[in-house]
Design a protein with these regions (language model features):
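Membrane-proximal helix-loop-helix units in multi-pass membrane proteins
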Residues: 67-127
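Membrane-water interface of alpha-helical transmembrane segments
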Residues: 4-8, 12, 93-96, 100, ...
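Selected alpha-helical membrane-embedding segments in polytopic membrane proteins
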Residues: 2-90
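Terminal transmembrane helical module of multi-pass membrane proteins
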Residues: 112-169
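Hydrophobic core segments of alpha-helical transmembrane domains in multi-pass membrane proteins
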Residues: 38-46, 101-107, 147-156
Length: 169
């Protein structure tokens, strides 16, 4: 029970942002067929970081003071930095690999979160995303890869965030 009230709120916030961008990119790819819409992914940190303090402010009771809360925050901060920087690099040197990398990193961060929380659902969801969704991307048309990211955001961010908030009550 090493949780602050609403400790999962940041995960829910970022999960919703990722889900909305995933659906937007997917719809635009389907409607236009232009892969340039993939650059919208960079809108996640551009929109998310300024909105984050406004949306989450005051909802996390003690600001993540426990070891577990700090560790989980650091896991996801590292994911955000790695995913943003590497996606930026890959967009120019190997754009076809960006989705695989991002989904694999998302799964890895979720697995680490599950291990830290000793939560088998979150751990399993991370493995499904990191391994299953990454492999599945090889079989989907490029236009459908954002749907893997949408599923991953629900499985690895939104649902675990809700679980964490309920566990803290």
């Amino acid at each position: 029970k090493d949780f602050e009230k609403n400790a999962g709120t940041p995960m829910i916030f970022w999960g919703v942002i990722v889900l909305l961008f995933s659906l937007a990119v997917w719809m635009l790819l389907i409607l236009t067929g232009k892969l340039e819409w993939n650059f919208l992914w960079f809108g996640i940190p551009v929109i998310g970081w300024p909105l984050y303090p406004m949306v989450v402010k005051g909802r996390c009771k003690s600001g993540g003071k426990s070891f577990i809360s700090r560790s989980i925050g650091q896991i996801w901060l590292a994911y955000g930095i790695f995913a943003t920087v590497l996606a930026g690099v890959f967009a120019f040197i190997a754009p076809h690999l960006t989705g695989y990398l991002t989904v694999a990193l998302l799964g890895y961060a979720a697995v680490m979160t599950g291990f830290a929380l000793k939560n088998n659902y979150i751990t399993a969801g991370g493995f499904i995303t990191g391994l299953g969704c990454t492999v599945a991307l090889f079989f989907f048309e490029k236009e459908f890869s954002p749907l893997c990211v949408a599923v991953a955001s629900i499985l690895n961010l939104i649902v675990p965030g809700i679980m964490m908030n309920r566990r803290a009550k």
